[in-house]
Amino acid sequence: MEILCHSAPLHEIKAEASLIFVINKEFSHEWIADSELFGSVGFEGKEGQTLFIPQSKTLYYALDSLTPDSIRESSAKALRALKKYPFSSFKVGIYTQESLECLEAMAAGFLLGDYNFETYKSQKSESKLTQILISLQTHLGRQIDSKSFETILARQSAIARAVNLARELVNTPPEDATPQKIAQAAQKVAQEHQLECRIEDEKFLEKEQMGAFLAVSRASIHRPRLIHLTHQSPKPKLKVALVGKGLTYDSGGLSLKPADFMVTMKADKGGGCAVIAILQAAKELGLELELHGIVGATENMIGGNAYKPDDVLRAKNGKTIEIRNTDAEGRLVLADCLVYAQELKPDYIIDLATLTGACVVGLGEYTSGVLGHSQELKHRFIECATQSGELTADLPFNRHLKKLIESKVADVCNVSSTRYGGSITAGLFLSEFIEESYKEKWLHLDIAGPAYVEKEWDVNPHGASGAGVRMVLQFLEQLTKES
């Protein structure tokens, strides 16, 4: 989708169709030419209501407030609606107050709303829409500088490409997204964007004594891979390590999932795919930092050599783990990868994982959990997530929940002794593999809810959303500004 800006007023721009947002039922605005028809067709200007007028080839989209979140979502949904018509282009004006936040949100909405996963469809949906023409004259008559627009568009385009890469990788079925193939996808990103890339196999994992990671992979015919991407700016202001859970398929292992719960488990690689995508965007955006992306890619399957409940595993840092449930496998892979990441001596560590169903139960499908020991760091991250348009909530650690992962036979147990607080106890488990010097510099993001939703929502299509990409990039940008 091509987005172009024009300095001319909206009515002077030539396009095959028009998109007009109706803000807070302001039917008298000069851009609204068909208001006399609204009453006869039942258009009241309620939030989310749409009306297409064939005579003027105009889609009206109503929203109650002019906030970035509202503009972003409305732009995505309006784009999807217009793609159903036989138009190759449409024009739209800018809706913004003094700041350019809403312009950013509009660009993001169009770019993120344009994605659709149809790789395996014999009949692809047909849309002629290829061009969006945006007037730089706002709905309040203010003129936006074209350079400001181009800067915003370039940034949002890089972010959208990354989000859509993550979506595509997560949506890809497990047979076509094995650990080896995800590693190949990472190599392709590295080659196209001049990133450093290391792909390590079982021999490396054995050498590094990553016993937890290796145990999870044992029963799969698709061998594990540790993916390590690096973006190195010429004068980095800081060093950050991202760690992603890359379970390309999770059957639950011997603690087998029920059939209904096994469907969509291709999405258990959501954290790892987000990490790969973030590295791509970091390079495109020219972020002034040294950024490491580490993905533990494997399957969790059943078989004669599968790891078992009652096993005791030894992680890379020497800690022993009692296994009581093989379906709590992602944290085992992350444990070894987090230890590996700390050896790089970064300033901050952030892990992303579709880690717990408990997080979805507690927060719903659309919100990610943010966990860590530093209240200040969590607060800063949540602010950045809000600016990016992603929903997050603080899930606080406490000493009582920590007792629930104690083991009588090992240093720690891989699951809690009760069914409650599962997303927090999972985070506390990961904390066991974070050195004391990094406790205040580490964040755990549980993206299990929004990573894959089987319906359209916000700017997202059915399926993978690319959860984590936007908010982590926003946070990395903020860190570089502060450094």
From Swiss-Prot:
What residues bind Mn(2+) 1, as annotated? 250, 327, 329
According to the record, cofactor stoichiometry and binding are noted as: Binds 2 manganese ions per subunit.
Chemical reaction(s) catalysed: Release of an N-terminal amino acid, Xaa-|-Yaa-, in which Xaa is preferably Leu, but may be other amino acids including Pro although not Arg or Lys, and Yaa may be Pro. Amino acid amides and methyl esters are also readily hydrolyzed, but rates on arylamides are exceedingly low; Release of an N-terminal amino acid, preferentially leucine, but not glutamic or aspartic acids
Q: Which is one Gene Ontology cellular component term of this protein?
A: cytoplasm
Which SUPFAM superfamilies has this protein been placed in? Macro domain-like (SSF52949), Zn-dependent exopeptidases (SSF53187)
The UniProt record lists the keyword Iron-sulfur: no
Residues of the active site: 257, 331
Tell me the compartments it is located in.
Answer: Cytoplasm
The entry's function note states:
Presumably involved in the processing and regular turnover of intracellular proteins. Catalyzes the removal of unsubstituted N-terminal amino acids from various peptides.
Family affiliation: Belongs to the peptidase M17 family.
The protein here is known as Probable cytosol aminopeptidase
Give the encoding gene's name.
pepA
